[in-house]
Every structure is written in C-alpha cells, then in structure tokens.
C-alpha cells in the first residue's frame, strides 16, 4: 500500500461553532497524519477559483458566499488510502443520509453547511493541496 495525501477543509459553519479541535482529533484518531494546516479567510477570487468546476450551477454563488463568510481551516492529511478513507470518515454530502459516526452526521447543519470538504480523487487532492500550500509548508512526519 502506498501512502497518499488528501486535502481537507474545515468549513465556516464548523469554525464558527468551535469544532476545529474536535474535527482535527477525529482525523488523528482515524490514522491520518496532519502534515500541513492553516486558517485562511477566502477572498471572492480564491473561493471562485477553488470551486471553478461548479461555475454556472445554481448553487455556485451561495457556495462562494458561504465559503467567504468566515475563516476556514485547510489541511493536508496523509495515510494509506487517504482519499478513500477520508471520504468514508466525513460521510455523504447530505448529513441526513450520512452514516452514524461520520463527521457530517455528527457536526453538519445542512447539505451546504456540512462542516468539511474532502478531495474526491488523488488528482483533485493534488490540485487542491497546490491551491493552498507550497511544498515548503508541507512537512513529512
């Protein structure tokens, strides 16, 4: 098995409710190493750029506004099967249908305010990591 990296966002709703520590703890309890992490406040340009694939969809503008509404915490996580395991840990986008014990089931408020984002492929993880981090901000552990 190869060690993989994935990208995580602790979103505005979770940051506002002081859930950063609880969510980071879940990452570590599930075998992820946090090899980079920082709090950022997205500009409109950053939010639109990050979600560019959704431009033109009806939820794009509200999503951009939501992601700009308060700081977020972006992280790079590492472990074997990181992308798949992280997606399992966070649960489905809609917290109502997420499995018990997942981050979204436990913390999300709604489908939009779903507390976390996770890369859906290794390719997207690499792109998303590079969007927020330089190589010198990522530390092997």
From Swiss-Prot:
GO terms for biological process: CTP biosynthetic process; GTP biosynthetic process; UTP biosynthetic process. PROSITE patterns: NDPK, NDPK_LIKE. Disulfide bonds: none annotated. InterPro entries: NDK-like_dom, NDK-like_dom_sf, Nucleoside_diP_kinase, Nucleoside_diP_kinase_AS. ATP binds at residues 11, 59, 87, 93, 104, 114. Pfam families: NDK (PF00334). Its cofactor is Mg(2+). It catalyses: a 2'-deoxyribonucleoside 5'-diphosphate + ATP = a 2'-deoxyribonucleoside 5'-triphosphate + ADP; a ribonucleoside 5'-diphosphate + ATP = a ribonucleoside 5'-triphosphate + ADP. Its main location: cytoplasm. Its EC number is 2.7.4.6. It is found in: Cytoplasm. GO terms for cellular component: cytoplasm. The active site is at 117 (pros-phosphohistidine intermediate). Keywords: ATP-binding, Cytoplasm, Kinase, Magnesium, Metal-binding, Nucleotide metabolism, Nucleotide-binding, Phosphoprotein, Transferase. It is an enzyme of class 2 (transferase). PANTHER family: NUCLEOSIDE DIPHOSPHATE KINASE, NUCLEOSIDE DIPHOSPHATE KINASE DDB_G0292928-RELATED. HAMAP family: NDP_kinase. Homotetramer. This is Nucleoside diphosphate kinase. The lineage of its organism: Bacteria, Pseudomonadati, Pseudomonadota, Gammaproteobacteria, Pasteurellales.
């Amino acid at each position: 098995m190869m060690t993989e990296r994935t990208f995580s966002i602790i979103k505005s709703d979770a940051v506002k409710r002081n859930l950063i520590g609880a969510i980071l703890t879940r990452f570590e309890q599930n075998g992820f190493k946090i090899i980079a992490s920082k709090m950022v406040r997205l500009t409109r340009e950053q939010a639109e750029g990050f979600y560019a694939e959704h431009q033109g969809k009806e939820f794009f503008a509200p999503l951009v506004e939501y992601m700009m509404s308060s700081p977020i915490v972006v992280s790079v996580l590492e472990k074997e099967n990181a992308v798949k395991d992280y997606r399992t840990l966070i649960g489905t986008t809609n917290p109502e249908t997420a499995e018990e014990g997942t981050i979204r089931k436990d913390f999300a408020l709604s489908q939009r305010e779903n507390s976390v984002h996770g890369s859906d492929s290794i390719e997207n993880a690499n792109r998303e990591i590079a969007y927020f981090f330089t190589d010198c901000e990522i530390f092997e552990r």
